[in-house]
């Protein structure tokens, strides 16, 4: 990866990132990621304006699903609702790991958020994580009165693999439910299992999400023996990889954001263009010099603050303009 392409502040932050092997011991990586996230958020100001409540909701094919509900303390009455789906390459991440991210979002936007702790690959490959997200969305839609959520202002969103799950969920909701979504917030979404775009080859730096991790993440999520480099995948569900969809009509308006130095920038641009060609309203933001997930990994950088504000403004416009 050519680090001269990075924003100067982000390049400086990247120098402090460790080079690590994510895949040799998944449990250790998950524990280390949780520790690093706690260390990072511990240095940030607390978000006192948001209250939370944990629930355990019915899963359609197994034990209950943990979800966390976030709500602004100072707002009363019905508010718009967002199902938030955390990132982590389909193999890492948790509700707890995204807790600070969601608190910031709720504080800035003023909506109710349900964050879902979906099952992870490789222990639970597709369709298990997607089914958990669908079950969580159905729970949100069926409990709007209890949650004080406006049933006519439901949305979904996520980052990285969470953005990929959100994109697939939007397709599934269109095809298989009567839930009406008014918006999808897709932050650097991981949506193309084929890994053949130019940008997917360029990011090899082991300090950030790179091509190798992308190949392994998809292999685990799709329950394959080999990566797609060794054995191209066929007949992949559009709900697993949204770029596989041939019909993008009838989907909710989308906000898609990604850094210019992200393995996903090409697939995200292409998906945004295809949505627009299908009559779906799209706001695409490409942040010059941003690596994967920069706005939350390096939260104090100027570019990160600007990016988050654009995310929040897009969500405010979608949820409160109607």
Mark where each language-model region is.
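A glycine/proline-hinged amphipathic helix-loop "lid/cap" segment
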Residues: 1-69, 227-232, 320-322
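Alpha/beta hydrolase fold serine-hydrolase catalytic domain that processes acyl esters and thioesters
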Residues: 151-152, 168-322
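Alpha/beta-hydrolase active-site loop
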Residues: 124-146, 311
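Short beta-strand element of the alpha/beta-hydrolase
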Residues: 78-87
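Short amphipathic alpha-helix adjacent to the substrate-entry channel of hydrolases
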Residues: 96-115
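Gly/Ser-rich "nucleophile elbow"/oxyanion-hole loop immediately N-terminal to the catalytic nucleophile
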Residues: 141-156, 176
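Short beta-strand-to-loop junctions in surface cap/lid or active-site-entrance loops
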Residues: 67-78, 243-248
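Gly/Ala-rich beta-loop-alpha elbow adjacent to hydrolase catalytic centers
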Residues: 158, 162, 166
